[in-house]
């Protein structure tokens, strides 16, 4: 099942470059995924009360052209039918109003036992309700990124209440916001990103002290977030 949604940018989604920020794009993708879940009757809040819920274990994002502040766009999403025992991918295609691709993304999804902090196997209905499709937006996914041994900058922040979601963890899109804190100023302002790969290992929670470290490699910048 493909789910489509039109999005009208709000003023808090614009960056100083006049483009929609990648943080806002990621939030839009996440919002549309939640709307798709509601359409299928998959109540994530009820799942959270039962201490077993969907989590995203990573993002692979390819940026072709960020929409400008006055440009509406549409998002198409679906669950991929290439399903493992413990994980699958949710596909996203962000397009301008003419249907031209602007952003392609994959979210790696699993179901987590929130008490034991361990993934659990999908049930017969977990993914079937989404009527998975074989289409994929990224033919050559980026492998997980190893943390560098040497860093060129770092910043320490404390996790706030506003960073926490209904699972009582830092929300998955907020980690990109944290990573932006150590990027070079010009890159942050201009938003000249071509690809972003996010790996999640362990969730941050309220009042955690997070050290955000920046490294530069031949492929680009790498940000690692450590819990003190």
List where the protein language model places each region:
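Hot-dog-fold acyl-thioester-processing enzymes
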Residues: 1-56, 100-106, 113-194
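Structured core of small recognition/catalytic domains
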Residues: 166-228
